[in-house]
Amino acid sequence: SAQWLVEHGADLNDEENPSFLLAVRYADQKVIDYVVEHGANIHALNSVDVDAFQAALYGKRYENLQLIHDLGHSVQKYGGRAFRNVITDQNYEVLDFFINNSVDINYNKPDSVYPFKPTPLCVAARYVDLQMCKYLVEHGADVTITEKDGMRPYSIAIEKGDMEMAEYFKNLEPAEYHDKQNKMDQLKPFKLPKVLISFLEGDNLYFELPDSDFISIEFLPLLDTVPFKWGRRKLLRLSKELGEYNDYQIVWDPKSKKISCYDMEHQELRELCKFDEFISDMAEQLETLF
């Protein structure tokens, strides 16, 4: 028992498994109060950076969430990560607890699960959960915050092909986001060739690539292209999807004035060719990636 361990000099703040995390994950208030009284650190993280809120959620000890908050590990200061992680569980009672205690609803710090800096709303959009998206928006979630690679909830809905969700976000966004002149101004620094602009304004943006490992490629309409930064370099995402390769994106690189492929997982950029060369034989150009 906890008492026996304390009496025999156990380190309550062991770096691998701090006692406070074990208590909130597996035990009740009596044990939690006991370890805290004997010096357990309420802000402790374990070896994989899990905090008390996450530990209680892993153990489904939802009744301990309020205790953790009341002991001083506050939702406002520390609850963002656990809140974002619990979005995919669709447990609205738990989400209400965090929101009622002033969680940062737009929390978007990177971690091992979400290195690409999504907000909880972006996570809900990625799971194509419109009900959750509406719930978060009703509680103040910002629809304009982008992930590390420029994707915002609207762009995610477009990528997922969920037009109902895309329309929902579009109606919440500033009108200039969907204004052509505004988009052209935004794209000026990218120095897009005229032929690329007219291609992206055209109706034919989906291509089957039967002889290629990529199977198919679909481009984003001009208005939905996504500017983002790779280090200090500006890139423009052009592809909506590249067959089964979810981590690859076809981008325009204004520095080289060429089409390139951005590998999201490894954060690498592979230069391909000029746009007219790319469009004349997409399958062959893409094969060079292997």
Predicted regions and their residues:
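Well-ordered alpha/beta subsegment
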Residues: 274, 284-290
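Ankyrin-repeat boundary/"N-cap" motif
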Residues: 13-22, 45-54, 76-86, 108-122, ...
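The conserved C-terminal loop/turn that links adjacent ankyrin repeats
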Residues: 9-11, 39-43, 72-75, 102-106, ...
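Ankyrin repeat structural motif
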Residues: 1-7, 27-37, 60-70, 90-100, ...
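A generic tandem-repeat structural signature
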Residues: 1-58
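Acidic, serine/proline-rich, intrinsically disordered low-complexity segments
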Residues: 91-92, 104-107, 114, 118, ...
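A surface-exposed partner-binding patch
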Residues: 149-252
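A short, surface-exposed interaction/processing loop segment used at functional sites
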Residues: 256-279
